[in-house]
């Protein structure tokens, strides 16, 4: 086999696997230029590379919320750096995962990971492959899907930078209202949808703090209760969606905005890239010193 034939096989292997030039060259050399065996070699080598990176922390990446027909999904795909989250391979993977999730049913992350995409790889296999080809740990972290009933509408919002996404499910037919509240959720990050969801322990703790207020001192019991109620409502507006002033029309609460538009809040969900992941603190001076000693 001459050099041009070898170069042609390397080119073909790169097109098939999307692997780097040196990896394809090595795969063909290791398999005596058998294309099928070289593909298998790259797959196994990719799994080994991914396994080596499995202990790394992937806290960057992108989130996305999307709607197709009567289905909606929200998911997070992580990388180790924001730079990688902007490259074409990562963005293509986001597109493929989004399409696969919205087209298929899943009840858990395990079932979501095993959904097949258009390239005949499962989501888990695709992220493993991406880890090998990109060179960073790529992690499909979480996902949720809604399949809507006839009287339901859902609003989806993904911030332009891809770091925040939200879904808001309502009983009603007004898609614009649902999307507007989804945008509100992304911006204001409420902890609870309604006051009924706030743990009683948290309510009692707030009341105990408010009772220390000088504004209550010397007031009759009835007036104290009125002031206390006002303080509590103001506090709830900080972290309860329906109590919050609506960002597009602050004279209305979100609850009032929904009622005015014949919509009833059913469920909300908001993802932010990396939330809850403990990032490793890097001491660059120590790291450089350690490298110099090697």
UniProtKB/Swiss-Prot annotation:
**What are the start and end residues of every segment in region (Involved in Mg(2+) ion dislocation from EF-Tu)?**
81-84
Task: Report the GO terms under cellular component.
Answer: cytoplasm
State the compartments where it is located. Answer: Cytoplasm
What's an example of a GO molecular-function annotation for this chain?
Answer: translation elongation factor activity
UniProt entry keywords in alphabetical sequence: Cytoplasm, Elongation factor, Protein biosynthesis
Q: Does the keyword Transit peptide apply?
A: no
Q: Which InterPro entries match?
A: EF-Ts_dimer_sf, Transl_elong_EFTs/EF1B, Transl_elong_EFTs/EF1B_dimer, Transl_elong_Ts_CS, UBA-like_sf
Name the predominant localization: cytoplasm
What Gene3D superfamilies does its record include? 1.10.286.20, DNA helicase RuvA subunit, C-terminal domain (1.10.8.10), Elongation factor Ts, dimerisation domain (3.30.479.20)
| Job description of the protein | Associates with the EF-Tu.GDP complex and induces the exchange of GDP to GTP. It remains bound to the aminoacyl-tRNA.EF-Tu.GTP complex up to the GTP hydrolysis stage on the ribosome.
The text of the family note is:
Belongs to the EF-Ts family.
Q: What is this protein called?
A: Elongation factor Ts
Query: What lineage is on file?
Result: Bacteria, Bacillati, Mycoplasmatota, Mycoplasmoidales, Metamycoplasmataceae
């Amino acid at each position: 086999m001459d050099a041009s034939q070898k170069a042609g096989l390397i080119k073909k292997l790169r097109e098939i696997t999307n692997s780097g030039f040196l990896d394809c060259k090595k795969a063909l050399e290791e398999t005596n230029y058998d294309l099928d065996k070289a593909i298998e070699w790259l797959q196994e080598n990719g799994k080994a590379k991914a396994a080596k990176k499995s202990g790394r922390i992937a806290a960057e990446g992108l989130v996305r919320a999307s709607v197709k027909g009567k289905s909606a999904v929200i998911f997070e795909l992580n990388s180790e750096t924001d730079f990688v989250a902007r490259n074409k391979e990562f963005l293509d993977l986001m597109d493929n995962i989004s399409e696969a999730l919205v087209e298929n049913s899943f009840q858990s992350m395990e079932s979501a990971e095993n959904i097949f995409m258009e390239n005949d790889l499962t989501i888990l296999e695709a992220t493993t492959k991406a880890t090998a080809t990109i060179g960073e740990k790529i992690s499909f972290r979480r996902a949720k899907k809604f399949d809507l009933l006839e009287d339901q509408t859902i609003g989806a919002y993904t911030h332009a930078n891809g770091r925040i996404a939200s879904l808001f499910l309502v009983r009603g037919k007004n898609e614009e209202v649902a999307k507007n509240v989804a945008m509100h959720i992304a911006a204001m990050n409420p902890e609870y949808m309604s006051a009924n969801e706030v743990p009683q322990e948290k309510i009692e703790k707030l009341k105990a703090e408010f009772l220390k207020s000088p504004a209550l001192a010397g007031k009759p019991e009835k007036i104290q209760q009125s002031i206390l109620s006002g303080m509590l409502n103001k506090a709830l507006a900080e972290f309860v969606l329906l109590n919050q002033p609506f960002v597009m029309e602050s004279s209305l609460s979100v609850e009032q905005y929904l009622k005015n538009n014949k919509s009833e809040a059913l469920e909300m969900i908001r993802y932010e890239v990396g939330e809850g992941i403990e990032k490793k603190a890097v001491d660059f001076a120590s790291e450089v010193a350690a490298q110099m000693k090697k």
